Amino acid sequence: RLFFDIISKLPLLFSKDGIKVLKSILSLIYSKSDLNQKLTKVLSTDNSTAIYQHFLSRKAWEEPTESEILKFTQAFKHKPLISIITPVYNCPKIYLEAAVEGVKAQSYKNWELCLYDDCSTSQETIDYLKSIKDTNPKIKVAFGNQNLHISEASNKAFELSTGSFIALMDHDDTLHPNALFEVVKFINKNDEIDFIYSDEDKLTIDGYQTEPYFKSDFNPDLFLSNNYLNHFSVIRRSVFEQAGKFR
């Protein structure tokens, strides 16, 4: 396994960050300590962010340009309104604002953002939501007078929505600019689709993407033991209502 761990990281060795890793490995090879133990230690150190950044830089070449996105969108047979429902509770402004701005930056424009504050006690959270309320007709904000917890608060956010598809986004999530575009492109390939889920990753405090979670195609056996759907998920409205919403 150790051998394959090294081989899997070879592309990184030719990057700037990879050279540092290689130097670390070589210096440890000539030390008096056990080679296998030392190599394992190097490979287990936090180089994952650098490796993932290398992967993302390569994938960036595959991203469609603005003109390509416009061309695709104009050709779409289906251009559904996507309602993004987001329950909010005591979220720091820096994360909540990033979530809102990420939605506003979407390349697919037929969306609405439905924010329901679950009786936050953080004045920072309340003030920010008040500051954006009624500033954009596509952004709906409502305030609860009691804490209902996430399931019922999500239902309250859903009550603000009108779209034929709903998207689930946490108050501290940030969407890729083409997230909704990719969702609608998939819907146009299969107009009977009811549920879409995506890969996800995390952001460091400095804004670097890390800890990718690459998900399989739908796997009923895996799903029995691992709820890998989560973020980012998009559900047809009628199916969500038929299921009885969140409970």
Per-region residue spans from a language model:
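Acidic donor-binding segment of Leloir-type glycosyltransferases
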Residues: 104-146
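N-proximal low-complexity "stem/linker" segments adjacent to membrane-targeting elements
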Residues: 27-104
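Conserved nucleotide-sugar donor-binding catalytic segment
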Residues: 220-247
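Acidic metal-phosphate-binding loop of nucleotide-sugar-dependent transferases
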Residues: 119, 148, 173-174, 200
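Short aromatic/hydrophobic "clamp" motif used to bind/position activated sugar donors
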Residues: 166
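Glycine-rich, basic loop-to-helix element that forms the pyrophosphate-binding segment
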Residues: 144-161
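Conserved donor NDP-sugar-binding/catalytic core segment of glycosyltransferases
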Residues: 174, 178-210
